[in-house]
Swiss-Prot record:
InterPro entries: aa-tRNA-synth_II, aa-tRNA-synth_II/BPL/LPL, Anticodon-bd, Anticodon-bd_dom_sf, His-tRNA-ligase, HisRS-like_core, HisRS/HisZ, HisRS_anticodon. GO terms for molecular function: ATP binding; histidine-tRNA ligase activity. Signal peptide: none annotated. The gene is hisS. It comes from Haemophilus influenzae (strain 86-028NP). This is Histidine--tRNA ligase. Its EC number is 6.1.1.21. GO terms for cellular component: cytoplasm. It is found in: Cytoplasm. It holds the Pfam family HGTP_anticodon. Transmembrane segments: none annotated. One of its GO terms (biological process) is histidyl-tRNA aminoacylation. Belongs to the class-II aminoacyl-tRNA synthetase family. The keyword Aminoacyl-tRNA synthetase applies.
Amino acid sequence: MAKTIQAIRGMNDCAPTESPLWQWIEAQVRNVLNSYGYSEVRMPIVESTPLFARAIGEVTDVVSKEMYTFWDNDEQLTLRPEGTAGCVRAAIEHGWIYNNEQRLWYIGPMFRHERPQKGRYRQFHQVGVEVFGIANPEIDAELIMLTYRLWKALGIDQHVTLQLNSIGSLEARANYRSALVGFLENHQDLMSDEEKERLVRNPLRILDTKNPELQKVLDNAPKLLDYLDDESRAHFEQLCSLLDAVGIQYEINPKLVRGLDYYNKTVFEWVTSALGAQGTVCGGGRYDGLVEQLGGHATPSIGFAMGLERLVLLVQEVNPNVPTKSAVDIYVVYQGEGATLVAFELAEKVRSELPHLNTMLHCSGGNFKKQFKRADKSGATLALVIGESEVQNKQVVVKHLQGGTDQQTLDLVNIIDYLQTQF
């Protein structure tokens, strides 16, 4: 027997028993985003490597350690580690944002070569939202309200907490960086080699360290909010006022900086403790300089992304009222001379006349006992039964699989009217 081939570590299959929950979550995402007037876009999963180096920052962990990169002839290409850079590239390339505002969203797989752990994998799926051309804090508030509405639709709103911060302008961050480095240089004995490297290359990333001793030291570190420029401070204060007005609770987290270099002003995360250690469900912020950095006109921008794997785990943990199996409504069984053709015609008629119902046709043979076992296993509400006598009499037997009336016989011409009364 040939040796079987396994999935690559950190890249997982989604089983038939798991996909209904994914589909339900994705449907809630689409419904909420469409209700706010956002438009879906689709980008390639492979981009030119320099796109991410320029957008995310060469000293970030993502670019320096985690990207899947390869050569195609003389061009270096990368499996996308996130969606914002590709969306900005597409917006510039196709002129979507020239003298125009856009509210866009996308969904799809991303790739990072990091240590797989619960809810975080090397191939993972993200929903991303990007807004171009709006500078005021009202759009910051709208994105946060949009995510909160999605949490309510998913039944997880009581299990997530909003954390906010402002990281100001590039100049304000540079001033803060100097103050932070000056403070941390006296505590290098508490740092790992990786943290010492971050102190030199990207010191703001030390603020979200998991090192408990260093976390205690950081409680007394300079606060980024104390170094904000006046414009960023006013922007942040207005955002907080808008959230207060609509009743969205938040915590100001002065250590929140996000992991990518393109952010400025507002940054936010929705976090949860329902999965054990506190983890991020959704994160985003402003990146007003990124469009120009990638060759476009100066364009104020903001966005967020949420990981679907982490979201699936959270919904499973806290919301018992979610679908756990495919929604088959009607299962058609048949046996005997002439029954195959009638059953096929019946199944197609139901699909045509009642397209909102999911109709499964038994195609693997066997006696009625075997077929009804399959029908029960499918979770269908009704079975439509065609045997030799039903073929001769132009009838169909309706069997209730989830309790209620046991079964009844109807003329085939009346079956659609009957099904409309049942669903």
